[in-house]
A protein has these predicted regions:
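Conserved N-terminal subdomain of the carbohydrate kinase-like
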Residues: 1-105, 109-117
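Conserved phosphate/ATP/ADP-binding segment of small-molecule kinases
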Residues: 117-189
């Protein structure tokens, strides 16, 4: 059985992050190992939330997994609570990702045209560097705009979407999928 490590927050409310990733990957027949970046009362899309930052726990967890000779067949990241955490996760990837293992990055940082309040203004620039070398990234339309420096447009044309995808892949990404936008007159995400 393949073993994937997913590194992202645990949101008590919000059907996202580790609470969504673990059962979905498990149902696909993959052993899913979760490493939490933060414990959140509810996800950061709510007006307010309570958060326990787990940055200081990432290195000891990584060290323990290495001592136990635990291997992974891929890495999947979601919400990363700070630039400092990105640096810890890059070190984790250097230690555990083997050549040929997929790196899947969901560059979670905003929704509805706005960056999450908990993140700093320099976060999108740092995320651009983090996604270099990823096999797949899945930004939503807000995150795609933040990564490419474009103004938010909730309903980009097909041409604009293709331009954004080309820009995203220009950051050294193999494949990019933009999620969560609607077409005028259409429902769905």
């Amino acid at each position: 059985m393949k073993r994937i490590v997913t590194i992202q927050d645990f949101s008590c409310v919000g059907s996202c992050s580790l609470t969504a990733a673990i059962p979905v990957l498990s149902a696909a027949g993959v052993e899913c190992c979760g490493i939490p970046t933060a414990l959140l009362s509810n996800h950061t899309g709510f007006p307010t939330f309570y958060s326990i930052d787990l940055t200081d726990e990432l290195a000891p967890i990584s060290d323990q997994l290495k001592r136990e000779h635990i291997d992974f067949d891929g890495v999947y990241t979601g919400y990363i609570a700070s630039i400092d955490q990105i640096e810890h996760i890059e070190e984790f990837i250097r230690r555990f990702r083997k050549p040929g293992d997929p790196l899947f990055i969901d560059p979670v940082m905003g929704d509805n045209g706005k960056m999450y309040a908990a993140l700093t203004d320099d976060y999108p620039e740092r995320m651009r560097k983090f996604i270099e070398g990823a096999d797949i990234i899945t930004p939503n339309i807000t995150e795609a705009c933040l990564l490419t420096g474009r103004s938010f447009n909730p309903c980009p044309t097909l041409h604009e979407t293709k331009e954004m995808l080309r820009e995203l892949c220009g950051f050294g990404v193999k494949f990019a999928v933009i999620t969560g936008f609607s077409e005028k007159g259409q429902l769905g995400a």
